[in-house]
Amino acid sequence: MKIWVDITAPAHVLVFRPLIQLLRERGDEIEVTAREYAQTVQLLELHGIEAELIGRHGGRSRLGKLGTMATRMTGLRRWARGRHFEAALAHGSHHLTLTARSLGIPSSTTFDYEFATLQHQLGCRAATFVVVPEAIPPERLERYGVRPPKLRRYPGLKEEYYLADFEPARSALDALPLDPERVLVTVRTPPDVSLYHRKSNRLFPQVLNHLGREENVQAVVLPRTDEQRDFVRALELPSVIVPEQAVDAQSLIAFSDLVVSAGGTMNREAAALGVPVYTTYGGRLGGVDEALIREGRLRPLTDPRALELVKRDGDGGRVRRDPSLMLELLLPV
């Protein structure tokens, strides 16, 4: 089978890495497109995935997103036409599902946050199948035109599938000036450029200021953009480390005592790896986060002083799942 995969954000590289490997092992031909956004290209190179770069992120404004979407879809259509794809796969890329539909290619999209309304109104309606975690109530997807048999659901977190074969490498942290006696906290900045996260996260700067002045803490901050990196460095907080280059984030999480994240992927990676994690997300919580909070695997944070800054003992209950199940659900034919 000839399959097209479109990757539009760094996390999508991690999701599709084991799936692409499984497809190639069974003899399928895979071609990948990607857009330039954050560390997407770096991660593709790190994992040895060749991709055709088409388009870039549209920035904060809706007008910018609309313009880059039109340009990118034109580029995708021009690239894909005549390649005779039998299936197209994406993680939330409405660019792919819309383009695939216009070319008559069956497509599947997957996501784990149901309130990215505009994105899902476009992407879900164009897709042949929509694959989501069981934690998302099906009725929340009906407004996007998603019902069985179009709807396919999987147990657990997507991170439990793509991290199934992951073993953390302590050597990945050698470039960081870490003191093993201090509490290691991994901190992820808010997704301020995301369309569904329109308001700034007021809690996050308070958390950063609190951690950055704790003498028994080392907070490794992983910014999403150069602008965020410059902002954090300018604060000159004594207990904050901002890596000069991209780091193995999954290994960093695995060896951390605590994770504090304003996004979603890193929260769920920590939960999958059994690491205590707090969310400072300022938007509406989705079904996955709601389930993790009920299970005690994710803690909502409203006051930085509530952080339990202690050394961790043990793996906290890591969960692994077979990525072949995810692949079976995604394949639209």
Where in the sequence are the language-model features?
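Catalytic donor nucleotide-activated moiety binding site of glycosyltransferases and closely related
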Residues: H47-R60, L208-P243
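A conserved, positively charged/aromatic
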Residues: S108-T110, T117-V132, I253
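Conserved nucleotide-sugar phosphate-binding/catalytic loop shared by glycosyltransferases and other
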Residues: R24-T68
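Donor nucleotide-activated moiety binding/catalytic core segment of transferases
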Residues: R72-W79, D226-A262, M266
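A donor-sugar binding/catalytic signature common to diverse glycosyltransferases
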Residues: A88-T99, T109-T110, L252-D289
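Catalytic binding pocket for nucleotide-activated donors in carbohydrate/polymer assembly enzymes
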Residues: A272-G316
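A nucleotide-sugar donor-handling region in carbohydrate enzymes
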Residues: T128-S200
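C-terminal amphipathic helix plus adjacent low-complexity
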Residues: G314-V333
